[in-house]
């Protein structure tokens, strides 16, 4: 969003609807192609990824230790949940488009479906499975699919539902790629730290990784409740003021 919304806002202000749709098609096609490859590699290489980020479990799996079963279960669950990356990528893009057009309620409500599908999976699917833990992985997959499908009728309403096409060299895509570099660095620092902690926790007692996850959720709670909500609304407004070349109004909005 940090890279995409400002560029789209600029196109929306300076260009006609056709240029905006061409930008969206190029972004969707380019991003979709990359994410599809990453998703396929993640599904096919789930065992390698689990070994990489769960060294302790992998070590026990190699030597017949007590955590060997955890490695196999984690690998299977990662294989089921990894397509969520594909779904959430396009869900986030659709949400950014809707936010740019002032349709904040749709993207704000969308995450509710992930919670509902996970609860439904735990309630109805888990009793049917030999390994009930798999039900939550299925819930994540279905939650991603439902979120993905939910927003697209609203894109059609604003005539921004486009057919993706490859556009690596499209000027808008080039600009987004340039803006993404610092944004990715800022976002990745905390995630890399969490992955390293997960690697180390895999050598500890059962539940250590869960403790880390719960503490991270607790840390993210105020951020998601206030900071994300404010930034979701204010980013399109700031992007419009930047596109209007109105630094005074931009500054007043930031001061607020």
Which residues does each PLM region occupy?
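Membrane-embedded alpha-helical bundles of multi-pass transporters/translocases
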Residues: 1-256
């Amino acid at each position: 969003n940090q890279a995409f919304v400002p560029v789209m806002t600029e196109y929306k202000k300076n260009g006609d609807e056709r240029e905006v749709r061409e930008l969206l098609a190029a972004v969707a096609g380019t991003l979709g192609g990359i994410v599809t490859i990453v998703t396929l590699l993640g599904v096919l290489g789930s065992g390698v990824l689990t070994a990489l980020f769960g060294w302790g479990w992998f070590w026990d799996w190699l030597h017949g230790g007590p955590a060997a079963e955890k490695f196999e279960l984690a690998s299977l669950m990662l294989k089921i949940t990894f397509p969520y990356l594909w779904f959430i990528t396009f869900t986030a893009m659709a949400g950014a488009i809707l936010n740019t057009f002032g349709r904040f309620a749709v993207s704000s409500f969308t995450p509710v479906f992930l919670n509902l599908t996970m609860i439904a999976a735990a309630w109805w699917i888990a009793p049917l499975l030999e390994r009930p833990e798999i039900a939550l992985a299925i819930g994540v997959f279905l939650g991603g699919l439902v979120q993905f499908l939910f927003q697209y009728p609203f894109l059609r309403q604003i005539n921004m539902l486009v057919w993706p096409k490859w556009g690596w060299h499209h000027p808008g895509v080039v600009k987004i790629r340039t803006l993404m570099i610092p944004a990715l660095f800022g976002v990745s620092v905390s995630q890399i730290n969490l992955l390293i902690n997960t690697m180390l926790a895999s050598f500890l007692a059962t539940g250590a990784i869960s403790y880390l996850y719960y503490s991270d959720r607790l840390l993210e709670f105020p951020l998601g409740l206030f900071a994300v909500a404010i930034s979701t609304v204010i980013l399109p407004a700031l992007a419009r003021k930047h596109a209007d070349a109105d630094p005074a109004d931009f500054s007043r909005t930031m001061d607020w």
